[in-house]
């Protein structure tokens, strides 16, 4: 197994332009596919999740050209649903941002499609989405366990009408349903069962759909209305914002050991909820400055916070490791959906924080972190989870440094993360 040793870093300073957002990249690839016209996507993320989406689109007959550095893609729109005369089997790795939307999109056309993935993907639920698609007339069959991939879709189009979907597990299910709703036979009324998690991710979806000419009427996140007869039309060019979750590591770094760190590609005008991470850092005492398309974090004394993290579940993980450098006990609540991500992130985070000496309480949907008087070095297991690897890079700011096992798992969203991170070290 590959290991990366991060020696103690005394100061971090500089500017970084964040790679494109994973969740925006895969959404716009699918919207551009379903749209009329050609769409040029710039600042596209080059990572595993995006490669799985691109490979699947190519297999389905979608035409696109990708620049040499893989950050610009020109997609020739399919002008509606994807159909296939031959049986298609698509392998989607552990890419939830490809599995969920494609599962929904492939019910719209005609054909037989099987979606498979890595073993972890077979543990990541999709039942809430499939239940909703079945209400609209989809024919979906599970191949192993009910409610989980792999699955087969016998596509004949979707009817539209009233549909209920659970909102308490993952916002990706609703995102997938929203993106296909305009292409059903009738208007769609979506009613949310339970509390909707990660609302800002739904805002991203609705904003991107609007860019492609489709209106969603949002009734306080309880009900969503999508009128029939709408079509996706290419806006011509789409700039993919920098990934706000990826920005969180550099902002936390600036707050813990700045100097100052300026992150460009996200800012006040961002459509991503994860930029609110900077507000959480500010509550801990960090010195934060906002621009339209940048955020600066400067060093300050950090104190513990107690916060509901439902609105920023991915970036909240960075608060868990930043808490090692704050005075007091930090409590992050309403984070049950950490458990159904790339790994069970709640269990993984608790285990690894204890390795470096933190006192940790792991609840069903919360975690508390109290830093020790002195942090210990350790070899951090990353569970094939990009965010675990990046979060624990913060331990480089401890006097003991840290070892990261399997550092290349960052390829899911940020392949050269550690190179960029160490470049800012003084």
Curated annotation (Swiss-Prot):
Keywords: Amino-acid biosynthesis, Aromatic amino acid biosynthesis, Cytoplasm, Transferase. Phosphoenolpyruvate binds at residues 22, 96, 124, 172, 345, 387, 412. It catalyses: 3-phosphoshikimate + phosphoenolpyruvate = 5-O-(1-carboxyvinyl)-3-phosphoshikimate + phosphate. CDD domains: EPSP_synthase. Its EC number is 2.5.1.19. The active site is at residue 314. It is found in: Cytoplasm. GO terms for biological process: amino acid biosynthetic process; aromatic amino acid family biosynthetic process; chorismate biosynthetic process. Pfam families: EPSP_synthase. It comes from the Bacteria. InterPro entries: Enolpyruvate_Tfrase_dom, Enolpyruvate_Tfrase_sf, EPSP_synthase, EPSP_synthase_CS, RNA3'P_cycl/enolpyr_Trfase_a/b. Pathway: Metabolic intermediate biosynthesis; chorismate biosynthesis; chorismate from D-erythrose 4-phosphate and phosphoenolpyruvate: step 6/7. GO terms for cellular component: cytoplasm. It is an enzyme of class 2 (transferase). GO terms for molecular function: 3-phosphoshikimate 1-carboxyvinyltransferase activity. NCBIfam families: aroA (TIGR01356). PANTHER family: AROM/DEHYDROQUINATE SYNTHASE, PENTAFUNCTIONAL AROM POLYPEPTIDE. Belongs to the EPSP synthase family. Monomer. Catalyzes the transfer of the enolpyruvyl moiety of phosphoenolpyruvate (PEP) to the 5-hydroxyl of shikimate-3-phosphate (S3P) to produce enolpyruvyl shikimate-3-phosphate and inorganic phosphate. This is 3-phosphoshikimate 1-carboxyvinyltransferase. It comes from Shewanella frigidimarina (strain NCIMB 400). The gene is aroA.
